[in-house]
């Protein structure tokens, strides 16, 4: 169960990361559209799991390598944006959100 503070911080991070990816995402993912679908934050606000949806879909290995290379830059940009709202910028872990692919697969199976 998440507290009100966790919920507010996760929504703030989701909004600000969306803006960071809107500005920086073009150079990171070569023009692919990036959506921050969800942010889950630990109770101590020290770590955040960020779920991203990329269109057109990216390969998992390429996504992991790209995000590992750019995580510190993204965290720095996020820190510059939220420095007045949060005392500490959480460590970021990025995950590829495949829920849209799962929904499309279920929809395709139901149509058969």
Which stretches of residues belong to each language-model region?
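Charge-rich, low-complexity N-terminal segments
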Residues: 1-47, 51-112
């Amino acid at each position: 169960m998440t507290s009100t503070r966790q919920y507010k911080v996760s929504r703030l991070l989701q909004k600000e990361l969306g803006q960071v990816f809107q500005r920086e995402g073009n150079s990171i993912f070569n023009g692919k559209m990036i959506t921050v679908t969800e942010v889950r934050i630990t109770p101590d606000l020290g770590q955040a799991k960020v779920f991203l949806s990329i269109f057109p879909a990216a390969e998992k290995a390429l996504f992991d390598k790209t995000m590992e290379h750019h995580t510190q830059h993204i965290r720095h940009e996020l820190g510059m944006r939220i420095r007045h709202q949060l005392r500490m910028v959480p460590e970021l872990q990025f995950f590829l959100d495949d829920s849209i692919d799962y929904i499309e697969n279920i929809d395709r199976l139901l149509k058969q």
